[in-house]
Each structure stands twice: as C-alpha cells, then as structure tokens.
C-alpha cells in the first residue's frame, strides 16, 4: 500500500477534529452526545478523501446508523482501496466525566489486510518487543507468563508490572498477580491505551492482559505491530447470536488463537488523538483562540511519532 506523509497527516487531522468535537462535551455527563459529535465529524472528513474506504470495525451494523457502521463505504471511491477501523471515542465515560484516558482512534490498512473482528469479547495478551515472543502465551498459566517475563527482563517478579482492566471478570487474574507480588496498573476503561503501554519502557508496563473488546484488540494490534511487540487474541462468544455473527464474518474456528500477523497483514497506519489526558498523549487544550491536539501515530516499522496540531476555534 502506498502510504505517504500527506495521507498520514489526513488521518491525524481526522482524529484531531473528532477529538475536538468530543472535547466540547467533556465533563457534561453525556457520553452519547460526545460520541455522536466525534462520529459525525469523522464521517464528514473521511468522505472528503480520495479513497475507496470501507469500515471493517465500527460502531454497529447498518441498521444502527448514524454510527460509522461495519460495511459503510467512505471517501470518493476513486483512490486506493483501504479497510478502516474506528473508535471515535475510546473511553466515553472518561470524556463524559472529565477523567483521564479519552481518545479518538483510527487505523487503516490495504483492503482485506485488517481483521474484521466481531463485536464481542477477546482474551488478549501483549508484551514489549524486548521480551522474547515465546515468553508468554494465552495458553500458559498466569504464573508461567510472569516468571518467564521476570527471567527475560532479568528482574525479580515483584518488579514486573502488569496492566489489566479492573473488572469483576478479572478478579481471579488480579488475585493471582497480587499473590505473586506483581505490580499492578488497573484501568477502569480503555483497553486500546492499556495495550499500548507495553510499547515503551517509559510506561513501566511489561505485560497487558485480560478480556476486553475484540474490535479494540484489532485497533491496538495495528500500533503494536509498528513497535514489533507480541500480541495474541482469542475471541470469546457468549451467545448463539455472537457465534452466528462470527460465522457470517468468516470465522470458522471459534477457539482460534490469533497472532499479530493474522490480525494485521502488511502495512497499517494507526492514529490516536487525546481527548482527555492519558499516559500516551495529552488531551485537547485551548490556547488563545485555538484548540491544540496531540496524536500518537504509527506506520509499520518506518514511522512512530507524537504529532501536535492547532485548529482555530470557530464558535
């Protein structure tokens, strides 16, 4: 896929504008309006591009419009054929309650190179590229994974830090990690950002694990791929409807453990713009009469950067 700086900047512009629109609802206790504002501007800006775009990960099916729905065509239809994954507001509760962690996220890849994930849960594990890829596995015990990381990092188990969503479903895992004396970083929401904390030692996270959204797993995998990190995911289907939908999307082995190169095939671009502050990027701010945004951007192995943009306040 021919990716150039102008195209990358176009997607940075899209998530930046979506973040700004959501930012206008920060602290207003209305996550639905924040999400809708981000969706509307994201659709508007995507349709301005000379691309033949198709949503493969969005916010629902066709009958749930005006969300960016799975299968929706975007762009002029005259340019390159690309798959698009979006999460216009990752952490809607963060935005509604003016808490850290709100992001606007998009990932793109050549047509059929971005996994079309069903709207269901995924068991995930991600580690830094400096840890051997065979050190952890979804099929290993928690204890074995942690001990292997400690050995690979040449540090005591008590110095290993694990990041996981603070959910009742994770009580057993959290208890086991605590028994091992592992340092914990518990997240109330936002498992895209959580997974990306393994990309750099400055975040002091050795492993991200646990059950979160399947679509969010694919979005995170796009960025993790650029950093050479390890990621595994296995979908969890709770209802017959989940299974039926997965099969219609081409998933045959319901227990399959997906490796990173099966989720992201070839080149991909990932962009996340902060709405509220997070470990990854700063949230939207206002300086004089302008909005200032900060975006976390990756493109395969060739481009990893934090980009700042300014936009005039028009209202």
PLM feature segments, named:
Residues 74-75, 104-107, 204-208:
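Short basic, glycine-rich beta-strand/loop surfaces that mediate nucleic-acid
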Residues 55-59, 84-86, 95-97, 116-117, ...:
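General beta-strand structural signal in soluble alpha/beta enzymes
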Residues 109-110, 114-120, 187, 234-238:
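Short, acidic/small-residue loops that bind anionic groups at enzyme active sites
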Residues 79-90, 94-115:
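DPxDG-like acidic metal-binding loop motif
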Residues 111-149:
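Glycine-rich phosphate-binding loop plus the immediately following alpha-helix
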Residues 139-298:
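An extended, acidic
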Residues 1-85, 144-147, 151, 178, ...:
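N-terminal subdomain of lithium-sensitive/metallo-dependent phosphomonoesterases centered on the IMPase/IPPase/PAP
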Residues 5-8, 29, 93, 132-134, ...:
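A short glycine/serine-rich beta->alpha loop
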């Amino acid at each position: 896929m021919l990716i150039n700086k102008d195209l990358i900047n176009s997607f940075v512009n899209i998530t930046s504008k979506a973040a700004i629109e959501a930012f206008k609802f920060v602290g207003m206790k209305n996550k639905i309006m924040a999400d809708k504002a981000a969706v509307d501007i994201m659709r508007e800006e995507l349709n301005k591009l000379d691309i033949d775009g198709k949503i493969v990960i969005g916010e629902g099916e066709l009958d749930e419009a005006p969300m960016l729905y799975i299968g929706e065509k975007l762009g002029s239809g005259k340019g390159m054929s690309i798959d698009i994954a979006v999460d216009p507001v990752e952490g809607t509760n963060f935005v509604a309650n003016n808490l850290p962690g709100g992001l606007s996220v998009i990932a793109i890849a050549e047509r059929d190179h971005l996994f079309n994930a069903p709207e269901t849960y995924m068991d995930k594990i991600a580690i830094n590229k400096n840890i051997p890829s065979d050190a952890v596995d979804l099929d290993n015990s928690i204890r074995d994974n942690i001990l292997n990381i400690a050995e690979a990092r040449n540090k005591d188990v008590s110095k290993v830090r694990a990041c996981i969503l603070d959910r009742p479903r994770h009580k057993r895992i959290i208890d086991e990690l605590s028994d091992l004396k592992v340092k914990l970083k518990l997240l109330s929401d936002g498992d895209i950002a959580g997974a990306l904390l393994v990309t750099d030692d400055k975040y002091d996270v050795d492993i991200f694990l646990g059950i979160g959204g399947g679509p969010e797993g694919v979005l995170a995998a796009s960025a993790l791929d650029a950093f050479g990190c390890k990621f595994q995911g296995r979908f969890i289907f709770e209802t017959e409807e989940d299974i039926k939908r997965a099969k219609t999307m081409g998933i045959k082995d319901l227990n399959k453990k997906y490796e990173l190169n099966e989720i992201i095939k070839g080149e991909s671009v990932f962009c996340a713009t902060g709405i509220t502050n997070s470990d990854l990027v700063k949230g939207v701010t206002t300086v004089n009469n302008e909005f200032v945004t900060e975006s976390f951007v990756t493109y395969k192995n060739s481009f990893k950067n934090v980009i700042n943009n300014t936009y005039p306040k028009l209202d």
